[in-house]
Amino acid sequence: GLGIFGAAGMSAEQLETELSWIDERLDGKPYGLDLLIPDNVVGKEESFQPDRLLEAIPRGHIEYTEGILRGQGIDAVGLDKGREEALFIGRNLHPSGAEASMDVAFRHPIRLIANALGVPPDSMLKQAKSKDVAVAALVGAKEHALRQAKAGVDIIVAAGGEAGGHCGVVPTMVLIPEVAEVLEEYPEVALLGAGGIVTGRQMAATMAMGAAGVWTASVWLTTPEAETNPIVKTKMIEATSRDTVRSKSRTGKPSRQLRSLWTDAWEATEAPEPLPMPLQSLVSHPALAKVDKLSQSGHEGAQDLA
């Protein structure tokens, strides 16, 4: 297997620190990096302007989020500052921030770089090719797979709707054969399957449908090494296959996550429509960071939201 480091939520400076830590401990063993450079994001076509991002958040969304917290006995102290601190998310998703992250990435001995929510930028493809680094792209539909293959990626990760995090609606069992058929015209592109894969029999089934291997993620969040909030880790272990939802409440794009009072609140009839990326993250990140901290200190209201 090949370990992949998820760096979507990190600044270029943080990424440098983390990759240096990895390099010091892997003793030359190969590893990969997963970034998030979406095709569609608010403010992409202009220079990064943090003040304009903050101004674009409707007051109603802020008040609704504060109301969710108050309903669980959590105050809103620090959320304004938290939104300012969360601007790194918008910066990372902006082309300028993405380029900074890629500059850091290619200074390290990564063997694979992956991107989600769109075709990798030309600069990623060119730098990767010059350094003999494989490029992977995550897709949730056969049409997306075709775009990625035409763009020149080396690996396509077909992630079914069961996948944790950002995902489409096509089930894994339907998506893998569809993408495998598309890639018959691109034999140089490898296919990995993802989405709800935990056991050996699920891996075997995925490969029987045409994938060369699998890409797993959520399953590792419950391991002893994972830095997952222990409250969330317990919820994941105890959850059944019916305890996840596909929600825009975290990032503004559909992502599969454990159902909680947080996701329920954003599905309520009185809830505002989640904002587009990255604005919804600026709303959710400071609130959920507070929930995460309080839940680990024993706050029952926060634990229900986590």
Protein language model regions, located:
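Active-site entrance/lid segments in N-terminal catalytic domains of soluble metabolic enzymes
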Residues: G1-P187
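Conserved active-site-proximal phosphate/metal-binding subdomains
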Residues: F48-T65, V169-L192, V198-A306
